[in-house]
């Protein structure tokens, strides 16, 4: 009889003990995100959450997203502490533009070999994003998959569910000519356009940690977490009649603003109403990127655009500013002729 070595899951590259250590490490930060509607804690087969009692006709709103190749930049620079904020932001910002209050969030973290310190850093960032948006982190999946990822590489995805009163859903149907567009400033490129960012860094032979812009490194500018607008927008919605909100993500101005415009409507943007933050000017110059491509790829300093009646625009700017946002009137809604562009950016 031949003696054979007894193999374990750990021999195959999956360390269950490391996974358990990770859960123990993150329990405290996860607990800080708890909402009263959440039933139970981590470790169940599924997470239970009641609907807030204030809703008469609650409609659930769901979303899922990742952070694109911003994650590659974060891994290359070994900065894992804020990418989780980006992950939450990309999901909850998509929910709030429809008037929804985020309720709970789940994450998916996949890697070839689990580094507990890295994973804990990422998930701590996710918990921070949940706190900023008033959302409970109710669970997630940590997948250690040998042979699927190179070295210490990992990927993340997020899933969020929110709730909105049926009569208060914001879907753009109320947008009308004469509405004013109010912009909310972005914290940076947020989580979009990073394949182009990385190409520009490569072609221009730029080390982002050794390049300075306005007193901080280019790396800091590029890895600045995506701004979470949930609390500011929910507060605005409670006080004013909002007709539409666009979250400027992949596709920039040209593709995201039309998503909330009815047929026959056109957004006319005044480019002179704001100055691009330095990081966007640097990217355009270093990559010789056309103006059209900049507005197609990046937010160029505008994270969200709100459409509302003209007589409420000044009040909206005032309220958003009081909430800590940089806000300004960026344009108007006009009637569009058949076949006309839905977004015009006037220099």
UniProtKB/Swiss-Prot annotation:
InterPro entries: PurM-like_C_dom (IPR010918), PurM-like_C_sf (IPR036676), PurM-like_N (IPR016188), PurM-like_N_sf (IPR036921), PurM_cligase (IPR004733)
Subcellular location(s) per record: Cytoplasm
Principal location: cytoplasm
GO BP field: 'de novo' IMP biosynthetic process; adenine biosynthetic process
Enzyme class of the recorded protein, top EC level: ligase
GO molecular function: ATP binding; phosphoribosylamine-glycine ligase activity; phosphoribosylformylglycinamidine cyclo-ligase activity
EC numbers, comma separated: 6.3.3.1
UniProt key word Repeat: no
Keywords: ATP-binding, Cytoplasm, Ligase, Nucleotide-binding, Purine biosynthesis
Pfam families in UniProt: AIRS, AIRS_C
UniProt keyword Ligase, yes or no: yes
GO cellular component, one term: cytosol
Pathway: Purine metabolism; IMP biosynthesis via de novo pathway; 5-amino-1-(5-phospho-D-ribosyl)imidazole from N(2)-formyl-N(1)-(5-phospho-D-ribosyl)glycinamide: step 2/2
Reactions that this protein is recorded to catalyse: 2-formamido-N(1)-(5-O-phospho-beta-D-ribosyl)acetamidine + ATP = 5-amino-1-(5-phospho-beta-D-ribosyl)imidazole + ADP + phosphate + H(+)
Protein family membership: Belongs to the AIR synthase family.
PANTHER family: TRIFUNCTIONAL PURINE BIOSYNTHETIC PROTEIN ADENOSINE-3, TRIFUNCTIONAL PURINE BIOSYNTHETIC PROTEIN ADENOSINE-3-RELATED
HAMAP family associated with the record: AIRS
Name of the protein: Phosphoribosylformylglycinamidine cyclo-ligase
């Amino acid at each position: 009889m031949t003696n054979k070595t007894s193999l374990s899951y750990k021999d195959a590259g999956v360390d269950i003990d490391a996974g358990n250590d990770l859960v123990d490490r993150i329990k405290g930060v996860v607990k800080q995100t708890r909402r009263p509607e959440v039933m139970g804690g981590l470790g169940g087969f599924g997470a239970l959450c009641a609907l807030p009692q204030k809703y008469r006709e609650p409609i659930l709103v769901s979303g899922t997203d990742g952070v694109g190749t911003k994650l590659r930049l974060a891994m290359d620079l070994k900065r894992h502490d804020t990418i989780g904020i980006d992950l939450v932001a990309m999901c909850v910002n998509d929910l709030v533009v429809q008037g929804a209050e985020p309720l709970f969030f789940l994450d998916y973290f996949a890697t070839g070999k689990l580094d507990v310190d890295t994973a804990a850093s990422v998930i701590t960032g996710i918990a921070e994003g949940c706190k900023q948006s008033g959302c409970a982190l109710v669970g997630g999946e940590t997948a250690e998959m040998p042979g699927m990822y190179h070295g210490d590489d990992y990927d993340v995805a997020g899933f969020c569910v929110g709730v909105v009163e049926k009569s208060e859903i914001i879907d753009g149907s109320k947008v009308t000519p004469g509405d004013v567009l109010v912009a909310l400033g972005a914290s940076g490129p947020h989580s979009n356009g990073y394949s182009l960012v990385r190409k520009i860094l490569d072609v221009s032979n730029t080390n982002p940690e050794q390049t300075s812009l306005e007193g901080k490194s280019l790396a800091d500018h590029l890895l600045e977490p995506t701004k979470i607008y949930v609390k500011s927008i929910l507060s605005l919605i409670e006080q004013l009649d909002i007709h539409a909100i666009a979250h400027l993500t992949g596709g920039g101005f040209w593709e995201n603003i039309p998503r909330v415009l009815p047929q026959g409507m056109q957004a006319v943007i005044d480019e002179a109403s704001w100055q691009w933050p330095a990081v966007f000017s640097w990217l355009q110059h270093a990559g010789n990127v056309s103006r059209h491509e900049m507005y197609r790829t990046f937010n160029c300093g505008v994270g969200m655009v709100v459409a509302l009646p003209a007589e409420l625009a000044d009040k909206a700017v005032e309220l958003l500013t009081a909430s800590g946002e940089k806000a300004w009137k960026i344009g108007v809604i006009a009637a569009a002729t058949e076949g006309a562009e839905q977004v015009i950016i006037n220099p």
